[in-house]
Amino acid sequence: HCGQEFYRSKDGLGNTYNTLDHINAVNWSLVDENQEDIETLKQMIQLRKENGGFKYETIQEVNEYVSTNHFDYRILRYCVKQNKGKYQEIVAYFNPSYYDFEINDMDEYEVIYNDHESRTYLAPISMKIFGLKR
């Protein structure tokens, strides 16, 4: 998916493995325009590399160590427990709505990723990730 991080659409084609280079080429002029999102993507890749909980290989592992919850029919809470890594548990909140959400009961957790200043405020169309250290 080369170029995906720059929001290329590959001219709207769904499967481009056999198309010309100009369809699959990275448009480097979009780097500056999307630098903040690129940095976020780098942080998410690093988080995944450092935490085995994002790399479970079997459905049994996923069923045992991963859980999800919905709040107010809008907010998704994704929780991963892991045996290795800096954190014993990682909790991510995703808010795809246009409404604010207050996060509670995370005082013992370290903020891993926060796209807004507040620790407990989840802004519209945002995410926040917490980790419980070992």
PLM regions: where:
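A broad, structure-centric signal for solvent-exposed, well-ordered loop/edge residues
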Residues: 33-35, 110, 129
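C-terminal beta-strand-rich structural cap/linker in extracellular carbohydrate-active enzymes
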Residues: 117-134
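Loop/helix patches that line or flank the sugar-binding groove of alpha-linked glycan CAZymes
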Residues: 1-106
